Each structure stands twice: as structure tokens, then as C-alpha cells.
Amino acid sequence: LIKNGCIYISSAQIFGFDGNFYKKTNTSKPNYQFVLDSLSSKDKNKKSNLKLSINSLIIRHGAIRYDIYDAPYTSSHFNLKHIKLNDISAHIIIPYYTQDSTYISVKKLSFKESSGLDLRKLSFDFSFNKKCTKLHNFNLSLPNSKIESESLSLVYKTINGKIDNKTIAYSGAININRINFSDLKCFLPRIKHNITPLSLKATFTGAYNNINIESFNLHSIDKGLVFIGNVKLKKDKNGFIWNANIRKIESSAEWIAHTIKEINPSIKLPDFINSIGKIYYTGNTNGHDKYISINGNLKTDIGNILVKLSKNVNDIYVN
């Protein structure tokens, strides 16, 4: 329904669609170019008046294929030049969409990709306007992994319709309940399946020239690795200034050696590594430009080390 210049769709259901999109070469036009041309304004300086509202869009058993024919195939690796999606299912609501403001609610999106990627569920609420962009209720589920974020927000000012980068401020929180590397094999083909899954929680704030990771908590599911700390990073005219407080790194030489072997079996570690036993470190590291300072306390089963190290340009100082 088109009313008062707005395209309003109360409900739409699409079942069993099969889309085939391609480019003959990387530089040639795609086979859907005529659609893009029909939607684009002839006057490049004219503001789009498109207004769209979809109360409910349901997709079931869809498939999409995209190829650039002169690009090589990689059957077990995810390849943006050869994408093949199957079993696409989605429920999407778009209360409003205009050039100046948008609200999109993805209740569910799932699909399988030929490289092995299996997206079980993606859901989120996304909005933007001339003052802010927000991502709420983000949930991503793979067969053995789950990532969540209650809120990611970006505020800014606009000048002549464009975001003024120097006014940007952002904040957010990420909760990776579990990330299993077997789910990412299509992106990281060399990594083996039996690397211990990891969990991560982090909160952060920042602006145009700085970021403050207020809390960072990384640990393996088997507790073989625990990393807790916070980081501040700022950029000025002379380069980057950074400070990292490491509240705790806890692991063992055995766990580290096993993980390195799973990542790259060709790396051979010295036999004495296992005798180090448990590892515990706490400390601080900071720097600016070419200066680095490390201060900390390293404890192991074979002894303790008080670490005081600094580097300025090409000179290294050990206390």
C-alpha cells in the first residue's frame, strides 16, 4: 500500500525463494544493476523521499547465491566472492525507514552457508537518527557459541547531513557467553576443533580520539586461562598514549603449551616449559609514542619474578 508518499506493508510472507546474483568479473556490473538504477535518483544532489514501513516480514526456506565468476573458489573457507546461503529464515519488522531516521527490529534470522557457517539465530533492534545510533538486544547463536549485547550506542552531531567525527562518543557492553572455535572453522581453517572454548565480558566507553575499556574479563571454559583487567587508549598529536592495568592473568604452562600446539603444531616448545607449572601475573603496562614501561609480579611453581622493564626508542632498561 502506497499512501502519502509512504510504502506501507502490513504483512508479507515469502516462502521458498531462490535468488541468483553474479558478476562476470570483479569490475563488471552485477546482473541486478538495472534494479539499482531504477531505485537511484537521477539527480545525485536530490534528497531521497523514500519512506518505508513493514509491520511484519516473514521469510522461510529461502536461498541466495552470489558469485564473481572470475574469482577462485574456496570450498571450506568463507569467501565473500562466492556466497551460497540456504535454509534462510527470518522475521523482520521495520516500523519506519527514511533517509534521516530508521528503526529495524530483526526478531530472528538464520541460515546455513556452504563454507560450513551455521547461523542458528541472529536478533537485534537497530535505530539511528541525526543525533545517535543504537543497537539493542543483540543476540547471536551458532551451534556451540553465543554472543550477547544489551546495548551499543553512538552519539554525535551532524553538519550538513554528515556526522562530525570529532563529536562522536560511544559506549557499550559485550557478553560472549561461549565462543567455540569449531563454529569459526570457515574463517580460521588452521585452528583445530579441540581448543578450549572461551568466554568474554567487557564494558567500554570512548570518543573520537580515545577508548576506555572499563572492564575486561576473559577466561576459558575449563578455567585454564583467566585474564582480568582494564585499558585506556588515547591519541594525540604525538601518537598513542595507553595504560593497561592487569589485575590477574592466571594459567599454566601445560594449558598454554596445549593451546599453542592446537593453533600451530609446527611450533616446538622447549621441554622445560611444563616444569614452570602454574602461572600467575599481576601488573601494569603503559606507554606513549616509542616508550613502553612494564611493571609486574610473575609467580610460578619454580619461583617468582619482579618485572621492571622499560623501552625508549631503541634502548631497553631492566631493573
Feature locations, PLM:
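Solvent-exposed beta-strand/coil patches in large extracellular/periplasmic or lumenal scaffold regions
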Residues: 35-73, 88-112, 121-122, 134-138, ...
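Long, compositionally biased, intrinsically disordered segments
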Residues: 172-174, 184, 193, 198
